[in-house]
Every structure is written in structure tokens, then in C-alpha cells.
């Protein structure tokens, strides 16, 4: 048909930490495993990721858990991909959230921009090691890691690439 895809799915990872019926493990252990599983399936390393679409539900426990996982994967290795979340613009789509975020990230890859995190006035000091961007940048990502976490410690990660 001659249609160019918006993005290519390189890999995915899933892991559950079962810490609590409602929340993920406070240290982000399940999300770390899901990210590592996605890297393995995609055949890439953390150094190849230039943008992370965080799950970022704006909850103290959830954001802290995800922040620790991202710190383990990236900051501890002196890597600083751009990180933002589209939820502040779209709201939480509940069971649609990960699909909606995949569409938005695919559009960002195709159109050549990196979405910023809306409505951040003061970044929590515990996230200062992370490269959280607040405004949209007109530089498109090449390799994107997109996180989704759910009740009971369910974690799914997709890795998308510019085709």
C-alpha cells in the first residue's frame, strides 16, 4: 500500500510485583523487571532510549515507585533520556491509558516532537536526577520506552522505534 508506519514495536516486557492489591512495590521492583524484559526482547540497552513516556498518575506512592525504577534503570548508569507523561493533558484513560499513550507516542515519533509534562510547577526533589521535561520539544524521539502500571503491581512496558 505504500503507507509508512508511525512507529515500530521493538519489544515489550511484563512483570508483576504483587506488593499490594492496590499499589506497586515502593521501590519499583516490578517495573524494573518489566523494563529489563522489554530491553531483552527488543535487543537494546538503556543507553539507546532517548524518551520515556512515564505512567505518572500524579500519586505520591505511584510516582515515587516509578521514579525509583527509572532511577535504577537510567540515572544509576549516568543516562538521562527525556521523561514526560501525557496524562496531565489527556487524563487517566483507565483501561484505555496504555493504548492511548502508545498512539500519542507513535504520533510524536512520526511528527518529530517530544511531548512535555503539563502542569508541573515544582518538581519533587526526589525526581531531580531524572530528565523530566516540562514543555514540548521539537525534537522527535528515535527509541521510546512507554510504561503502564496497574492495580496489584501489574507493569507493562513497550519499546517503540522510529521506522
Regions found by a protein language model. Give the residues of each.
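Conserved beta-strand-centric core segments of catalytic alpha/beta enzyme folds
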Residues: 1, 97-163
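Condensing-enzyme catalytic core mediating Claisen C-C bond formation in acyl metabolism
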Residues: 1-42, 50-51
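Beta-strand segments within the central parallel beta-sheet cores of soluble alpha/beta enzyme folds
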Residues: 4-12, 47-54, 81-88, 116-123
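Conserved small-residue
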Residues: 9, 49, 54-55, 66, ...
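A glycine- and small-aliphatic-rich helix-loop capping segment at beta-alpha/alpha-beta transitions
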Residues: 26-30, 65-77, 161-163
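Stable alpha-helical structural segments in soluble proteins, enriched in small hydrophobic residues
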Residues: 34-42, 69, 73, 105
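Glycine-rich phosphate/pyrophosphate-binding beta-alpha loops
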Residues: 57-59, 88-95, 148-155
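Conserved catalytic cysteine-centered active-site region
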Residues: 67-99
Amino acid at each position: 500500500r505504500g503507507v509508512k508506519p508511525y512507529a515500530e514495536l521493538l519489544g515489550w516486557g511484563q512483570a508483576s510485583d504483587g506488593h499490594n492489591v492496590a499499589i506497586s512495590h515502593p521501590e519499583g521492583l516490578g517495573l524494573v523487571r518489566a523494563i529489563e524484559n522489554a530491553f531483552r526482547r527488543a535487543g537494546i540497552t538503556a543507553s539507546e532510549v532517548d524518551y520515556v513516556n512515564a505512567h505518572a498518575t500524579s500519586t505520591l506512592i505511584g510516582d515515587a515507585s516509578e521514579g525509583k525504577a527509572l532511577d535504577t534503570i537510567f540515572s544509576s548508569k549516568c543516562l538521562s533520556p527525556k521523561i514526560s507523561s501525557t496524562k496531565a493533558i489527556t487524563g487517566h484513560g483507565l483501561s484505555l491509558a496504555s493504548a492511548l499513550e502508545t498512539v500519542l507516542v507513535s504520533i510524536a515519533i512520526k511528527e518529530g516532537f517530544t511531548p512535555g509534562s503539563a502542569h508541573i510547577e515544582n518538581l519533587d526533589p526526589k525526581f531531580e536526577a531524572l530528565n523530566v521535561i516540562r514543555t514540548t520539544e521539537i525534537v522527535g524521539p528515535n527509541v521510546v520506552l512507554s510504561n503502564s502500571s496497574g492495580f496489584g503491581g501489574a507493569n507493562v512496558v513497550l519499546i517503540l522505534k522510529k521506522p
